[in-house]
Design a protein with these regions (language model features):
Chain A
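Cytochrome P450
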Residues: 1-408
Length: 408, 499
């Protein structure tokens, strides 16, 4: 019986045999609920940059220096396509799919709203949301940290950031939740995307007539150079990217970090004793250890780099979460150590596409942790409950059932 | 052996043994011969190691041997897996990967493609050779719930999905129409023009043989021949796309033709216009609009004749055993006049897609089939089909998945992005038009050669348009097909036909 191309291991002639290492980024049997540790272990013996013949065949980059070299070289490694395996008519996101300098005006338009000053100003609102969400979850005793906390918090923050009508919180949360639950259902995603964009479009109209100091009003007014403002389509596209980028990421970094924290009673006791003093260090270490985004690149110009022949049309996957656990950069990289000296990592990538929300994302985890330990004495994994996960370009924890001892 | 396709054939072999079951190019296959021949085929299959549930793939143009092989396979408890005789080796290989047949049979013109796809087919002449011979019977009877066929359908995905019917679903489908349509009793004469590898061809064959009718199989649509056949053989049932009825009416001999034998005349795939209705009404015939899809078993609803006269474009209100709803995305029923997705429920619908639990769960929810089609019910519950959610191009009655064409076109060097849309075509109704963007125009002849090598001929684009600008996108980052359709509405009038 012949096999269709999709099932084949694809190894083009330019790929040398010593760089081939089998790994299925979507469903590798070696990866478990502790995704980061098991993923790292599975590829520990693979070369720094290797060719995975599965999923149409693509390069995988696991070392921090190699990742930095590729992320800062848009001339050879383009963001134009980000699908593995490559698909016909890949989606195009503003500004994610734009190589510099085209992406710069859009980043400049967003930057002031995501800087430390703006995020600091948002903190009281983040705190209020975190408290409210944790209180609601605690009412339940045993609950799913993902569904009840990690998934709802970033949606609320997104609405706050955009200046959305918070009386529609539940409606929009429900929309967001269904969107991320139906990732494999193209028809549902299409319908839900339409509804989300409908909400955004209504928001644009509202902010045109009654502007405020929130992000959507800022998008409407932002000078893109030469006095040009963004078209409605551009604003919608940017809003959609922020929606995608702001939810799944913070949700899953938080989820994986709390999965680990649930198994570390000593660290919980320290955080309980001094949440305000230690939450920043915890957030930093959570971000270093539990990155969830792997960034694809398309080779658009042949280049030999680090002994690897990258050829036009090859797909490359930068394993940011693995790069942030590079044992050449970190002592005991798989240990969550909040006393670790702060060192650069690549969870947020680097170069022209450095995550614009990195200050906000870190702040969300920090504030959530402070509010958590105001209310929680200790918590642990609920015994014998499965913790499903998915891998791919974004790694996600789909459920995290926890048992909680509330603070007295 | 109760409520199986095989039990119905055995019944008609007893009751109407000499009546033709199938007439193909003048060659007659009686129910008695069909019964004996298919029994011998079943015994041969079992002897070759075929077990209940195994797949038997068939890649051939229509022939009486094909018919015998279908009923023999079902009698042996195996599952018929028809392969489109137009398929290219790559399409065949992709299909075989999911069906994994125990045996593959091929017609003389299909052997080479199958070999190239990596299998060693048996020759259809092996089946032909069993037309005469000693009585033979398979040692066991098929069960009602055993699957009988996997029919490949084109959906909105790039790869076809296999619709699975069982003995029980196919007999229930036939039972519904026997109850509902007294105009097609046993002994009725039916024209069928569809290849047996299509849903229409396979379902008509099995439906009308379960019902004890005679099928006149035509190798292709020829309006003059059809008109002649209807009169000469006193044909009673005729189903086709509206364009076929128009071609027949355009024949000079139509004016004096005697069509009084026709009792059940249905049209699907496109709307029946008032003008078409009136042309045939002058001959005493009411063309009735149908709606259905492979997944529901075939037809789901036929417009009642007395209502079709006033509302030719409507499709009826379901059937004796077939319920229809039109719903909003959240599953609640639409108000009369409100558009929504058409849902259907019947004992004749598929049990699911072959080895595809995700797509099955999507299509079958709480006992209802979600059609992916948009429709609207009027205040009397009569359905009007509005549009298909699935991205299909329907060319000469054959469904083409736009995504599949796009996948192959995008493989061609120099093409950055491409969409396939339907261009109107006087002969086929619709035909594929491809709009692509790249750094420069590509060699269209070479592109078409690439498509020819990887796609069945009817899927190969007939028009190719180059766009110097990137194609329009939605805010979600996806290409916008509605915007491209609008930009290229009249493109077929300006562009040359490239094949």
């Amino acid at each position: 019986m012949t096999k269709a191309p999709s099932q084949l291991r694809v190894i083009p002639p330019h790929v040398p045999a010593h760089l081939v290492f089998d790994f299925d980024i979507y469903a590798d049997a070696r990866v478990g609920s502790d995704v980061h540790q098991t993923y790292s272990a599975a590829i520990a013996d693979a070369p720094d940059v290797f060719w995975a013949p599965q999923n149409g065949g693509h390069w995988m980059v696991q070392r921090m220096d190699a990742i930095s070299a590729i992320a800062t070289d848009p001339e050879h490694f383009s963001v134009r396509e980000m699908q593995i395996p490559r698909v016909p008519n890949p989606p195009f996101f503003i500004p994610l799919s734009l190589d510099p300098p085209e992406n710069l005006p859009y980043r400049r338009a967003m930057a002031p709203m995501f800087g430390p000053v703006a995020v600091k100003a948002m903190e009281p609102r983040l705190r209020a949301w975190a408290g409210e969400i944790i209180d609601a979850a605690l009412q339940k005793g045993t609950f799913d940290f993902m569904a009840d906390v990690a998934k709802v918090f970033p949606v609320s923050v997104f609405m706050e950031l955009m200046g959305m009508d918070l009386s529609r919180l539940h409606e929009f949360r429900d929309l967001a939740e269904r969107f991320f639950e139906n990732q494999n259902d193209a028809a549902q995603i299409e319908a839900l995307s339409g509804q989300i964009l409908g909400v955004m479009k209504a928001l644009i109209d509202e902010k045109r007539s009654t502007p405020d100091d929130k992000l959507m009003s800022h998008f409407i007014q932002a000078d893109m150079g030469g006095g040009r403002t963004m078209s409605e389509d551009e604003i919608l596209a940017m809003s959609f990217v922020l929606f995608l980028g702001g939810m799944d990421t913070v949700t899953n970094v938080t989820g994986f970090a709390y999965q680990q924290l649930a198994q570390m009673p000593d660290l919980q006791a320290r955080l309980m004793a001094d949440a305000e003093g230690l939450s920043g260090a915890f957030a930093d270490e959570a971000v270093r250890m539990f990155g969830v985004v792997n960034t694809p690149r398309l080779v658009v110009k042949d280049i030999d780099l680090m002994g690897v022949p990258f050829r036009e049309g090859d797909m490359v996957l930068n394993l940011l979460p693995i790069g942030s656990r590079d044992d050449r950069k970190f002592d005991q990289p798989h240990v969550l150590d909040i006393d670790r000296k702060k060192v650069a990592h690549v969870t947020f990538s680097t170069g022209p596409h450095l995550c614009i929300g990195h200050v906000l994302g870190r702040a969300e985890i920090k504030v959530l942790t402070e509010e958590w330990f105001k209310r929680v004495q200790s918590f642990s994994l609920a015994a014998d409950k499965p913790r499903p996960f998915r891998t791919g370009t974004v790694m996600a924890l789909e459920a995290l059932p926890v048992s909680v001892n509330a603070a007295s | 052996m109760s409520q199986t396709v095989s039990s119905a054939i055995a019944w008609w072999a007893r009751m109407r043994g000499d009546q033709p079951a199938v007439v193909l190019a003048g060659e007659v296959l009686s129910y008695r011969t069909l019964q004996d021949w298919s029994d011998r085929v079943a015994a041969m299959l079992v002897g070759a190691g075929v077990e209940p549930g195994d797949r038997v793939a068939i890649c051939s143009t229509n022939s009486l041997a094909y018919v015998a092989l279908i009923f023999g396979t079902i009698r042996a408890g195996a599952i018929v897996s028809p392969i489109n005789f137009r398929y290219k080796p790559r399409e065949i290989a992709e299909l075989l990967e999911t069906t994994e047949p125990r045996l593959v049979f091929a017609g003389p013109d299909q052997v080479a493609a199958l070999r190239e796809a990596g299998v060693s087919p048996r020759d259809m002449s092996m089946v032909e050779g069993l037309r005469e011979g000693r009585r033979a019977t398979a040692a066991y009877d098929p069960e009602p719930d055993w699957p009988v066929v996997i029919i490949a359908t084109s959906g909105s995905t790039a790869k076809p999905k296999g619709v699975v019917f069982t003995n029980r679903t196919m007999t229930a489908y036939a039972a519904n129409w026997s109850i509902e349509e007294p105009s097609a009793p046993a002994g009725s004469k039916v024209i069928t023009m569809a290849p047996l590898n299509t849903s229409a061809g396979f379902v008509q064959l099995v439906h009308y043989t379960i019902a004890g009718c005679t099928l006149y199989m035509e190798p292709q649509f020829d309006p003059a021949r059809a008109l002649d056949l209807i009169q000469r053989e006193r044909i009673t049932c005729f189903a086709a796309v509206p364009a076929f009825f128009e071609f027949i009416a355009a024949r000079p001999e139509f004016a004096n033709a005697d069509l009084s034998s026709l009792k059940l005349v249905t049209a699907g795939g496109a709307r029946v216009s008032r003008q078409l209705l009136e042309t045939y009404r002058a001959k005493g015939i009411v063309i009735r609009q149908i709606y259905g899809q492979t997944e529901v078993g075939g037809n789901a609803t036929i417009m009642p004749a007395h209502l079709a006269i006033d509302m030719p474009e409507k499709c009826g209100w379901g059937g004796a055993f077939i319920d229809i709803r039109v719903v909003r995305p959240d599953g609640s029923d639409c108000a009369p006049g409100e558009q929504g997705e058409i849902l259907m429920r019947s004992p004749g619908m598929m049990i699911g897609y072959w080895r595809n639990p995700e797509e099955t769960a999507r299509a079958l929810r709480d006992g209802w089939l979600w059609s992916g089609d948009i429709g609207v019910l009027d205040e009397n519950g009569l359905l009007t089909f509005v549009d298909r959610l699935k991205d299909l191009i329907i060319s000469g009655g054959l469904n083409i998945s736009a995504a599949e064409v796009e996948r192959v076109v995008c493989e061609f060097p120099g093409i950055r992005e491409a969409l396939a849309i339907a261009a109107p075509d006087p002969k086929f109704g619709e035909t594929p038009l491809v709009v692509y963007h790249g750094d420069a125009e590509v060699d269209v002849a070479a592109l078409i050669a690439h498509c020819d090598a990887n796609l069945s001929n009817y899927k190969v684009p007939r028009y190719v348009a180059f766009s110097a600008d990137p194609l329009p996108r939605l805010a979600t980052g996806k290409l916008s097909k509605p915007a491209v359709r609008e930009l290229y509405t009249d493109a077929h009038l300006r562009l040359p036909k490239v094949r």
